[in-house]
Amino acid sequence: MGLAGVSKKIKYGKDPRNLGWSNNTERFGHKHMSKLGWKDGEGLGHEDRKAQSITQNIKIVLKDDNVGLGAGLAKADKDEAFGLMDFQKLLGKLNGRAQEIEAEVERQQKDVLRGKFGMVFVSGGLLQGTIEEFNKKRGSEAVEESDSDSEESESESDDDKKSRKSSKKEKKDKKSKKRKADDDSDEEEKKSKKSKKDKKEKKEKKEKKEKKEKKEKKEKKEKKDKKEKKDKKEKKDKKSESPTPHDGMEKPSASSTSALRGRMAGRAKFIRSKRMAVMDEKSLNEIFMVKN
């Protein structure tokens, strides 16, 4: 399972090979076996079969839990990856060993079933009596009847063949007619869909054109209005800037008026250009470097 698996801590004792238990002569097991005639260093089993007897020390496993016998098998199954057999089956198909893998899967399934429902079939022999003789007589009569039936069936089979052929031909004709009708209906549907699509496209194009024309008209009107406003403002500024002589006041000299006009004209021109720039969005965007 890797790092995601359950970590099992194993603590090794002072005697990991369990030699202290086997060498201890004070325990009940050692005393009981010595009473039965066993001596230290001898093997287990009958004296006449010492060649087949066990000569190694007996190793035991202490049961320190309350789980029943065979519970370790279930624990071993949990460690296996889910769907591993399916993955092996897929690999076997890719490698050209599909039959071997299927046979292995079938064997494993049978093992599981045998483990759950263990059964051994024992044959109990066959019953013998009058039933077998009756079946033999009945079989001979059935053979005679079958011979007579076969002759009749041969005569009827020719008519059946002809009727089958005619029915097959009729079915084939019906299928071909049905296919033609389906094809015609499909073509009509395609044509209707195409015409609808063309109409929709034409409508969309017309709407786009109308929108474009409206937009252009609106822009032209706005430009015209701006121009008219601009002209009106310029005329108004000119009127306001021109000096109005009052009655009873002395007229300025020609040299002073010419100088005044030159200064005022430059100032008025600057103010006019500034106002025009503020009113025009395009020029403002150019000044502030803003893209439309």
Swiss-Prot record:
Region span, Disordered: 1-26, 131-267
Organism: Yarrowia lipolytica (strain CLIB 122 / E 150) (Yeast)
Species classification: Eukaryota, Fungi, Dikarya, Ascomycota, Saccharomycotina
Domain of life: Eukaryota
Record's compositionally biased regions (Basic residues): 163-179, 192-236
A GO BP entry: rRNA processing
Role of this protein: Involved in rRNA-processing at A0, A1 and A2 sites and negatively regulates telomerase.
GO molecular-function terms, A-Z: nucleic acid binding
PROSITE patterns to which the protein is assigned, alphabetical: G_PATCH
Domain G-patch: 25-74
InterPro entries: G_patch_dom, PINX1
Protein name: Protein PXR1
Compartments, record wording: Nucleus, Nucleolus
GO cellular component: nucleolus
Stated family: Belongs to the PINX1 family.
Pfam families attached to this UniProt entry: G-patch
Biased composition (Acidic residues): 142-158
Key words of the record: Nucleus, Ribosome biogenesis, rRNA processing
